[in-house]
């Protein structure tokens, strides 16, 4: 009889836990994806903070030239970063127990893998948690679809790109200047500015910002007056009210006359779908572009493609980008034995577009 009571008690405890996890009455929804998300994001955050502050230098290139990224080794918030794991590790999974000692693990950049893998699992779980909460509330699932754009971008720079290049040392460092360094090297090695998917991403991000500002300013300018001049117009809205808080007809008429009639949406639902879809699709394409360039399917190369009647090169913007890329690549590869192949195997190229007159 005692055993039966204990089993029922255990079953009821598990049932209570399940109900708490899936309850939409909690102040913050947990969900089954949250059970995975919370510990992984906590682990990634704690390790990132400790490594950013106190991690020793990392032999990122695998040539016994450690690079310091933490604050206590002389960096500041701008220059500091969690340095990617060593090129000597390559694509090997490198948890703490794979190293001979903790010092070796730190020297080879083990914290980077710990942070990145837990972070990726955490954001995947966060996306699943968005779907789960939408499902519990009977909503459509498009919130997690929109969030898939930054998830795809993070996966591209932290996972797909290292896979394509053959080493986690080529992943994006976890810091401000490290991000810019990654962007410069990416341009030097893959000519991303001349890749159409990157162009679509730029149109998505900047276009999304423009459309967001246009929509917000139009709505704010066509609010239905519910307050006096001495009150804030925000007091004219009551949460959950049935009537529209702004006049979409007035906004449509204004914008239709400012541009032309069919440039303005007359359907609020299609408008907001467009506002969501534009940046999401753009960022999807950027992530896809990085993922293809990871395997060296690079941007267009129009270098020295325009010649005059005598066969001399007429330098274009493509040539400027190419020469800038060569300079960035030389700075990136700091060692003679690791010199960029496209410089070492080709004829010398003048750096300046026009040599200055001397004397």
From Swiss-Prot:
Its EC number is 1.10.3.9
InterPro entries per UniProt: D1/D2, Photo_II_D1/D2_sf, Photo_RC_L/M, Photo_RC_L/M_CS, PSII_D1
Where do the annotations place [CaMn4O5] cluster binding? 170, 189, 332-333, 342, 344
Q: Which residues form the propeptide?
A: 345-359
Q: Looking at the UniProt record for this protein, which Gene Ontology cellular component terms does it annotate, in alphabetical order?
A: photosystem II; plasma membrane-derived thylakoid membrane
**Sites where the protein binds chlorophyll a ChlzD1:** 118
| Binding residue positions for a quinone | 215, 264-265
Binding, pheophytin a: 126
Annotated site location: Tyrosine radical intermediate: 161
Q: Where does chlorophyll a PD1 bind?
A: 198
Subunit relationships: PSII is composed of 1 copy each of membrane proteins PsbA, PsbB, PsbC, PsbD, PsbE, PsbF, PsbH, PsbI, PsbJ, PsbK, PsbL, PsbM, PsbT, PsbX, PsbY, PsbZ, Psb30/Ycf12, peripheral proteins PsbO, CyanoQ (PsbQ), PsbU, PsbV and a large number of cofactors. It forms dimeric complexes.
PANTHER family in alphabetical order: PHOTOSYSTEM II D2 PROTEIN, PHOTOSYSTEM II PROTEIN D1
Protein's name according to its UniProt entry: Photosystem II protein D1 1
Native source organism of the sequence = Synechococcus sp. (strain CC9605)
Report which gene this protein is encoded by: psbA1
């Amino acid at each position: 009889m005692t055993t039966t009571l204990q089993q029922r008690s255990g079953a009821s405890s598990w049932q209570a836990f399940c109900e708490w996890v899936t309850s939409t009455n909690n102040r913050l929804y947990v969900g089954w994806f949250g059970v995975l998300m919370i510990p992984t994001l906590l682990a990634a955050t704690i390790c990132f903070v400790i490594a950013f502050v106190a991690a020793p230098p990392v032999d990122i290139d695998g040539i016994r030239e450690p690079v310091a990224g933490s604050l206590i080794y002389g960096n500041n918030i701008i220059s500091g970063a969690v340095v990617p794991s060593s090129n000597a590790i390559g694509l090997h999974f490198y948890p703490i127990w794979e190293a001979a000692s903790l010092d070796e693990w730190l020297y080879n950049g083990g914290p980077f893998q710990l942070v990145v893998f837990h972070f990726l699992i955490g954001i995947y779980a966060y996306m699943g948690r968005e779907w789960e909460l939408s499902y519990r509330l009977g909503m459509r699932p498009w919130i997690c679809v929109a969030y898939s754009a930054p998830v795809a971008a993070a996966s591209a720079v932290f996972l797909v790109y290292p896979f394509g290049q053959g080493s986690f040392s080529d992943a994006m460092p976890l810091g401000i200047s490290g991000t810019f360094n990654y962007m410069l090297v990416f341009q030097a090695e893959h000519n991303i500015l001349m890749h159409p998917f990157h162009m679509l991403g730029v149109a998505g991000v900047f276009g999304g910002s423009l459309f967001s500002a246009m929509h917000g300013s139009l709505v704010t300018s066509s609010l239905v007056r519910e307050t006096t001049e001495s009150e804030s117009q925000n007091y004219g809205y009551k949460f959950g009210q049935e009537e529209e808080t702004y006049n979409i007809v007035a906004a449509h008429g204004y914008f239709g006359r400012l541009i032309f009639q069919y440039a303005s949406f007359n359907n609020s639902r299609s408008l907001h779908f467009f506002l969501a879809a534009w940046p999401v699709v753009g960022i999807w394409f950027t992530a896809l572009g990085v993922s293809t360039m990871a395997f060296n399917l690079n941007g267009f190369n129009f270098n020295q493609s325009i010649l005059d009647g005598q066969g001399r090169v007429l330098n274009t913007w493509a040539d400027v980008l190419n020469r800038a890329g060569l300079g960035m690549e030389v700075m990136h590869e700091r060692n003679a034995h690791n010199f960029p192949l496209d410089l070492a195997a080709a004829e010398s190229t003048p750096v300046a577009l026009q040599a200055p007159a001397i004397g």
